[in-house]
Amino acid sequence: MNSKLVLIVAGEASGDLHGASLVGAMVKREPGIRFYGIGGVNLKTAGVDLWADAADMAVVGLTEVASKLRGILTVMHRLKKSMQLLKPDLVILIDYPDFNLPLARSAKKNGIPVFYYISPQVWAWRKGRLRTISGLVDRMAVILPFEEPLYRQAGVDVSFVGHPLLDVVQATSSRDETLRMFGLREDVTTVALLPGSRKGEVTRLLPVMLKAARILTENICPVQFLLPMANTLDETWMKDQIAKADPPGVRLIRGATYDAVAAADAAVVVSGTATLETALLGTPLIVIYKVSALSYLIGRMLISVDHIGLVNIVAGKTVAPELIQGAANPERIAAEILAILGQPDRRKAIQEELSHLRDKLGLPGAAERAAVMALTLIKKSDC
């Protein structure tokens, strides 16, 4: 295969992580292949020429979309133009459908094959997108087992490749080693706080979590908190957010997120991929979700699933308590964490349920299987 050029777009932190694994697997098979597009620190480290940072593209809710719309449209225009000028051999799209589907349409017009890795959550809302995807995407790799039959029924050339988190989610140190590394006590109850990877959701949810931490401090003596931060966020900004609340015993962690979560006795986690990561590490958790009132109202009318947390969606039942919108308040969060920590039998039952999730997510090696699919698509387009 001659030197090929691939446009890859990952607009969120999880897509950046999984995209980097995919790029690595493709380069391992075809060392001369080149990539450009949108991503974060992981895709940059993997060698992708970034035209925009995923941190500037990630949004939650209508109000955040409005504030970033101009910049997002500018980036989209540049990428569409690049298809005409650079003529990439393949477009790889990772989730992020409101941005990626218009790009897929442009790729189709320019005769460029489209590989979609990690499905938009059409099973939760906007199922009409299935028809759109069927007409625009040449090949799709999905990471949840129930997605494959859904897309196949819609006429999409789809394969379930397993969940990429199975290859990356693991602690590298024991609980005691991790706590010592962070300068914390090993004999103290530890709670992890995961407020998300997008600045907007962190602004909205971190103050609530920190108030809950203060309530927990009043009820558990002693207790300490680990706050792993996403690499999409600025450390100085995060420290400022924490300082405003002035909570006791909160340690901000950069890097070693999986070690930090695995070392915790319980975790408060914003809805999203982080709930599945926490579950795979075996840490009992509660899921919180909060957006603007308008976004929530519209979402209630459109969303057709019983759960908001990915951990519960995959399990098919409530494994982790969910606190949504008004229920995601400091008092309720603290009460749910106290219930987990104060009832050893309940905590053990949750951990047992979490241990079964891994079996539902397929086998390790998702990126390698997806890489073969993507490279095959490039070779087909050469014929």
Swiss-Prot record:
Keyword Isomerase in annotation: no
One Pfam family this sequence matches: LpxB
One GO cellular component, as annotated: membrane
Domain of life: Bacteria
Pathway it works in: Bacterial outer membrane biogenesis; LPS lipid A biosynthesis
SUPFAM superfamilies in UniProt: UDP-Glycosyltransferase/glycogen phosphorylase (SSF53756)
Keywords, in A-Z order: Glycosyltransferase, Lipid A biosynthesis, Lipid biosynthesis, Lipid metabolism, Transferase
Lipid metabolism among keywords: yes
Single annotated GO MF: phospholipid binding
First-tier enzyme category under EC: transferase
GO biological process: lipid A biosynthetic process
This enzyme's EC code(s): 2.4.1.182
Catalysis performed (reactions): a lipid X + a UDP-2-N,3-O-bis[(3R)-3-hydroxyacyl]-alpha-D-glucosamine = a lipid A disaccharide + UDP + H(+)
Function: Condensation of UDP-2,3-diacylglucosamine and 2,3-diacylglucosamine-1-phosphate to form lipid A disaccharide, a precursor of lipid A, a phosphorylated glycolipid that anchors the lipopolysaccharide to the outer membrane of the cell.
Family that this chain belongs to: Belongs to the LpxB family.
HAMAP family: LpxB (MF_00392)
Family annotation (PANTHER family): LIPID-A-DISACCHARIDE SYNTHASE, LIPID-A-DISACCHARIDE SYNTHASE, MITOCHONDRIAL-RELATED
Protein name as annotated: Lipid-A-disaccharide synthase
Organism per entry: Syntrophus aciditrophicus (strain SB)
